[in-house]
Amino acid sequence: DSKVIYREYIQNACDQIDLAIKLGILSSDEGYVDIYIDSKKRYISVKDNATGVRAADFIEDVGDIANSNKEIGKNKGFRGIGRLCGLAYCKTLKFTTSYLGECIKSIMTCNAEKMRAMLVENKKYTLDEIWDAIVTYSTESEEKNEHYFEVEMFGINKENTDLLNDKKVRDYLSFVVPVPYKNTFVLRNQVYSYAKSIDYSIDEYCVRVNGSQIFKEYTTKLKEQSGASL
C-alpha cells in the first residue's frame, strides 16, 4: 500500500514533536503535522512544527542515508533510509527544514525520475554514484523564530493516484497514526481513565489533511460475525 509513506513521515514528525516538547520548543498541545494534497498538481506536502534540523547538521542527518539517530523501541518512525520512501512515488522529493534561532533554511532536492532512469540503464552504478547524481543541496534565508521540517513530493506517479485521494488518505490515517478519539466515541473517557489508572501514556497528535483534523473513527456499534448488529 503506497499510503504507508504518510505513516512513515507522520511518525518521523511525531518523534520530533516529542523532542521539541522535551526541549521546551513546544508546549504539550502545540505540535502538529499538516498534510496538503493537491490532486490537480499531483503534489503532496507533509510539514511539522517540531525541532527542525540545524543547518550545520543537515547534510549528515538528512543527506546521509545510512545515518540515523532513531532508538529502536523508543522512536515511532523508521530509521535511516526510511525518509526516502517517497522516491518511489514521485518525480521529485524535497526536504526543507529550519531550526529555532537560525536565520536559514536547508533544502535537499532528490531527482527521483533520474534515479529510476539510472537504475534501468545497462550500466551498473554504485549507490554513491546514483546519490551524487540525483541530490542537490541549497540554503535560503528564513525567519529566526521558524522551526519546522517539510517533505514535498512533486509529480506523483500515475500508478500512485491513491495518494492523492483525500478521503482514502483520511480513512487510512484515522486507523494507523496516533491521533485522538472522536468526542462522539462514548468509550473515550473510559479509555483515558483506564490508561491513567495503569500509568500508561496514550500518544496523540494533531494531524490535519488539507486543514481538517484527523480522529480515530471508532464507534460503539457491535456486530455479530454475520454482520448483524447486536
Question: Predicted segments — roles?
Answer:
Residues 1-35, 82-88:
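Conserved ATP-binding N-box helix of the HATPase_c
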Residues 21-77, 101-230:
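Interdomain "switch/hinge" adjacent to the Bergerat
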Residues 40, 90-91:
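Short glycine/proline-enriched coil/turn segments at helix->beta-strand junctions
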Residues 92-96:
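Glycine-rich ATP-binding loops of the HATPase_c
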Residues 12-16, 87, 97, 173-184:
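A broadly tuned "polar low-complexity/structure-edge" signature
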